[in-house]
Design a protein with these regions (language model features):
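Bilobed "Venus flytrap"/periplasmic-binding protein-like clamshell domains
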Residues: 47-60, 120-159, 168, 183
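Periplasmic-binding protein-like
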Residues: 35-37, 112-115, 190-228
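Extracytoplasmic small-molecule ligand-binding "clamshell" domains
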Residues: 21-99, 138, 159, 223
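Short, hydrophobic alpha-helical packing/hinge segments within bilobed ligand-binding/sensory domains
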Residues: 58, 79-82, 166-169, 175, ...
Length: 244
């Protein structure tokens, strides 16, 4: 009898599944971006990040983390405090020397090249040392320890608000040497008023990292796993190539 009852129970028809309702929205990944950043790194429209390396990289990392990217644009001076307070989860394309604070740093992964570019209206410098005593356009608030090491007191800065403002001054003939990222120079040559310049002098090559908030929603270990995935899948190279 027990077996018969069990068979009957097994054969009993099941009712329709209970409705599950809409899927819960994905958790967010709040990505900080400096509002002073320009293309190819970032483009803002109506205070919203809409394009650039920061945009594409944030989307790629969020996807690997199973989260929805939310971009928070802030002025450079407010970046560190917002990250320390957990108002954002991370900021990428930085290195520790640029962002002092109690942050967890990801593994280095995004290739970057700092260069000095010189226009062709002046003699071509053969080495960085040839720039000693000559004015070099820089961006206000950015530090260049490698140039300081080579030039010492001969590192003469002229600070501007952005890389693009400095390159526009070069177009206008107002200055002759600019320190910038190779990617910025390449993008300007592709999309802006083309500069007549010598091949740039390399200052430094390095790999950009992500600073992860100690009070954020994601751990640096999880971010590193996501980075390993996008590097292995070639997405870092694809993002970089998109803006060359």
């Amino acid at each position: 009898m027990a077996a018969t009852a069990a068979s009957a129970a097994t054969a009993a028809p099941t009712g329709p599944a209970a409705p599950t309702g809409p899927a819960a929205p994905a958790a967010s990944l709040v990505v900080l971006v400096d509002t002073g950043t320009e293309m190819p790194m970032a483009a803002f429209r109506d205070n919203q990040l809409v394009d650039g390396v920061h945009h594409d990289l944030g989307l790629a990392l969020a996807a690997r983390l199973g989260r929805q990217a939310v971009f928070l644009g802030l002025p450079r001076k407010r970046i560190a405090l917002a990250l320390e307070q957990g108002k954002a989860d991370l900021i990428c394309m930085y290195i520790p020397g640029w962002l002092p604070g109690n942050f967890h740093w990801s593994q280095p992964f995004f290739p970057m090249r700092e260069v000095v570019v010189t226009d062709t209206t002046v003699p071509r410098p053969a080495t960085l040392a040839d720039l000693k005593g000559q004015t070099i356009a820089t961006v206000l608030g950015y530090y260049h320890p490698d140039l300081v090491r080579v030039l010492g007191a001969g590192f003469v800065r002229e600070d501007g608000p952005s890389n693009y403002s400095n390159l526009r001054k070069m177009v206008a003939g107002r200055l002759h040497h600019v320190v910038t990222q190779q990617s910025t120079l390449d993008y300007h040559q592709k999309t802006g008023e083309r500069l007549s310049v010598y091949p740039p002098l390399l200052v430094k090559t390095y790999l950009g990292q992500c600073a992860v908030s100690p009070r954020g929603q994601v751990s640096v270990e999880a971010v590193n796993k996501a980075i390993v995935q996008i590097v292995k899948e070639g997405e870092v190279g694809q993002i970089s190539a998109r803006y060359q």
